Amino acid sequence: MLIPSIDLMGGRIVQLVQGERKALEFDNFEEWIVRFSAFPLVQLIDLDAAMGKGNNRTLIGDFAKRLPCQVGGGLRSVRDAEEMLATGARRVILGSALIRNGATDRAFAETAASAVGADKLVFAIDSKQGRVAIRGWRELTSITALEMITALQQWCGAFLYTHIDSEGLMQGIPLDTVRQLRQSTHKQLIVAGGIATAEEIAELDAMKVDAVVGMAIYTGRMKLGR
């Protein structure tokens, strides 16, 4: 399944390269809402909130009312998750909140699942140089993606793996890594990071892995009708 991505920063849709350099910027929200309306799921990320530089909550609420969204970025508490679901999000994405003092926070994961239901939770694994990155990808931990999946999979409905090293480059995601992750969990697995062609989507589909695509859609390299 192809999941279009909407990344928000400063009240606009943006696309970043490897989470740092801004490559594209749009404010034609209505056009993208219409274009994405046929998809069963859209990913909505508040980059400002993820980086601790404000938020785009009002805009997120507008999108979530009109599109079936899983929403993430800066959700640090159970209350944050509950409030985002109340705005209309189908699911919420938790990432940095799952790491505490350099280790996976199983207690927080369990508390969140008890509060909103594991099926409403997507646990984000943002990987850079083989290690999980947190706080808007600015802080690198010693935890691997496989370790995070093993520790936390009983408390979520899906995992979202982002390969930061290839994010925004449109050069493909390493499929060997994806295969390892697929073998490690029975949960829904969603991946992101440089996916650029319909052929890649087909390969991932064959592995029962869903794909988040941003840059390739916004540049026109990947046509949504395919």
Q: How would you name each of these model-derived features?
A:
Residues 40-55, 96-102, 161-171:
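Glycine-rich, proline-tolerant flexible connector loops at the mouths of alpha/beta enzymes
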Residues 83-108, 163-165, 193-226:
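Glycine-rich phosphate-binding active-site loops on the catalytic face of alpha/beta enzymes
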Residues 2-8, 42-44, 69-73, 92-94, ...:
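Hydrophobic faces of well-ordered beta-strands that scaffold small-molecule active sites
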Residues 8-22, 89-167:
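Conserved anion-binding
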Residues 59-60, 64, 140-190:
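Active-site/ligand-binding-proximal alpha/beta "capping" segment
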Residues 31-45, 153-155, 159:
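Catalytic domains of carbohydrate-active enzymes, especially glycoside hydrolases
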Residues 58-60, 65-92, 176-211:
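Catalytic cores of alpha/beta
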Residues 19-36:
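Short catalytic helix/loop segments, enriched in acidic residues and glycine
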